[in-house]
């Protein structure tokens, strides 16, 4: 971006911050007179939003972030233009604000929308009804001559548009009690629709429950909508080297929901680090006790079984039945880098067996029955592969989505190879992945020896219902291996979170599921 463009953005951003300052001033002024406008900012948020950020004290939040090692990430990565503007120019606003202007940001929302670019947000803040004229005067007084302020009507409501050069336009809509600002005219139109029709995010009963369950009075909150867990309310806490988000899930009570599957599971303990190669950058652990629920949920989200034939569906069902009868406790899905950095990463499922001999006999019987029923030689083959001086018996399974469903990898194909190694069943998309894993383990190249891993795993509860740990920077390098178990909101903003390690735990207590996300900053200087 050239210097002229940056100057233009600073000027228009200054208007935005003046609006916010004015909003805080008038809100404070209104309190002293005894009655505020009472606008519920959530009633303006379009119902299709993916996340909502809320703070009642932006000034304190920015001061706290300024002292954190990861604070600079907010301005150096394309997370949100609106958020970046607020952070970049807050001190400038403080120095230039009119005398007596309150800088305590009392109520502020930012809603996030698809497709998740840095312009797909809307900022909302309250103002005192009747003081819109003051805001207009500030705009006219500070507006550069070469930036004519435009306006258009949408359903009888005026949208003000300020061209910022290039393809950037700052749009805002003001009405009695509030102002909404965005770099997207489309989103401002959706705000108007929600305001007129009343069809806002508050009409979502699950979101309403999430909002009602808010108990913490932290400096900021985040409401995140996920396909697997519904609306999550998360309270934000900022440590020196980590961002902590903890709260509660509010998924609807449906028999096939992921959250309700977790409610039926017994807590599990984390696997030892000696089963993961030292180059592992992604791992997840799930209980197998309610594997049918997990499979149904996965099928209904990213990897829709409806696009496959009856043979694939039948194979999935029978493999799930086989696993439930043989698995001991929980399973782990993980991805690790090869010794050759040029090669793609490898992904596997590692599943402890109750009795490996019985499990292998059951798998042979399953493959034999599938071949007879389908009258096909596709899959169902036994092959020998060698590594070093040892041979390993691989079972080439019939086409199935089982690997994708349980590993969480979005783009996994239907080929799955099974191998019994020690007391575990390994499932992989190809024999090379499994053999590479065995080579790493046999050489003693395990993550248990890594000091950073030990530090990160120390944040994990001793008992949980599911766990995901990943280096988001490495995960971003291989989008085809992106996991559906990463919350959508954070996947959409991977450029910001790429300098963090993510720990995502779900813990069930008294049939309520509590998510705990920890973003550990990787200060690699």
Can you say where each PLM-predicted feature lies in the sequence?
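Short beta-strand-to-coil "C-cap" segments at the C-terminal boundary of structured domains/repeats
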Residues: 248-253, 518-525
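An internal, short helix-loop-strand segment that often contains or flanks glycine-aspartate motifs
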Residues: 73-106, 143-248, 261, 265-273, ...
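Short, Lys/Arg-enriched, disordered terminal segments
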Residues: 1-8, 524-525
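Structural boundary/hinge residues at secondary-structure and domain interfaces
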Residues: 6-12, 16-161, 207-227, 244-346, ...
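C-terminal regions of mature proteins
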Residues: 498-522
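Extracellular/lumenal glycan-associated surfaces
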Residues: 126, 184, 346-347, 351-355, ...
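Active-site proximal loops enriched in glycine and acidic residues that flank catalytic Cys/His/Asp
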Residues: 285-288, 351-353, 428-430, 441, ...
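Exposed, polar/acidic Ser/Thr-rich sequence context and nearby capping/turn residues
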Residues: 38, 442-443, 525
